[in-house]
Design a protein with these regions (language model features):
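Class I S-adenosyl-L-methionine-dependent methyltransferase catalytic core
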Residues: 2-266
């Protein structure tokens, strides 16, 4: 065998070996995906589940600007990747203007959102409608907006049908305090400037969780958590996006909202 033919022969072997290794890797990945509830590999899960998420902030669009407090679509999409898969059914009991539904639309999940405020519910419908394109066709998945009190979850959703809940409840009457804080302290901050972030009271509705005193809020949210548990599948997840708060006006330096909510949910 000439040197040229030998090198060509070895090159073919190396190419063949590379393809075999690639195929083996693909097979291993497929096996991993088939064994997990979210179709993620171990590497993908590790990358998504880092303890600090500092890469999710994004400017508010024209739909989000109508709401007093919204979270980024990127946050919804990360949670969807981590705790669900394509075709799963997702719930947001405090829908707002529909951010959760948009994330579901982008990643091919079915979703239902419940929103007390009629104006916000209509904005959510408009946003979902405007987000349809060649890849998100109307007949492929179901996105439903319900204009009602989220205390009535069981009226619209069957037991054991929800894989994942993603929501951010009104922070009792914290929003009223935040209005003053944003105006006086964060006037020129990046959250108000580059991100177009705004804060305003949700409504004057007596049933609005955002108008309740803190202790009344915790009592009322317990019912929603119970309803949420009923409709969630065995092995399903609930992600509630919250933040702690300060009430210096009443001499309370720190309100551990996240732990109070967890205690109510026990």
């Amino acid at each position: 065998m000439t040197k040229k033919k030998k090198n060509l022969f070895l090159e073919k072997i190396n190419t063949s070996d590379s393809k075999l290794i690639e195929n083996e890797c693909n097979d291993k990945e497929s096996l991993q995906r088939n064994k997990t509830f979210n179709n993620l590999t171990a590497k993908e899960w590790a990358r998504l589940s880092k303890p600090i998420w500092d890469d999710l902030s994004s400017p508010r669009n024209k739909f989000q600007m109508n709401h007093g407090a919204v979270f980024p679509v990127k946050l919804v999409e990360r949670l969807l990747h981590m705790y669900s898969k394509v075709d799963d059914r997702i719930l947001d009991p405090f829908l707002g203007v529909g951010t959760t539904l948009i994330g579901c639309q982008n990643l091919r999940r079915n979703a239902i959102g419940i929103e007390l405020n009629k104006e916000y519910a209509n904005i959510a419908k408009d946003w979902v409608e405007s987000n349809y394109d060649l890849f998100n066709k109307r007949d492929d998945f179901c996105f439903k907006v319900v204009n009602d009190d989220c205390r009535n979850i069981s009226k619209y959703i069957e037991k054991d049908t929800i894989q994942l809940t993603i929501t951010s409840p009104p922070y009792a009457d914290f929003i009223q305090r935040s209005l003053s804080d944003r105006e006086n302290v964060h006037k020129k901050s990046i959250i108000k400037g580059e991100n177009n972030s705004t804060i305003k009271q949700y409504s004057n509705d007596k049933n609005d969780f955002g108008n309740l005193e803190y202790q009344d809020f915790l009592k009322s949210i317990k019912h929603v958590l119970k309803e949420n548990f009923k409709v969630t599948k065995k092995g399903g997840y609930s992600c509630w996006v919250v933040k702690d708060h300060r009430d210096t006006k009443n001499g309370i330096p720190y309100i551990s909202f996240h732990s109070d909510l967890a205690k109510v949910a026990e």
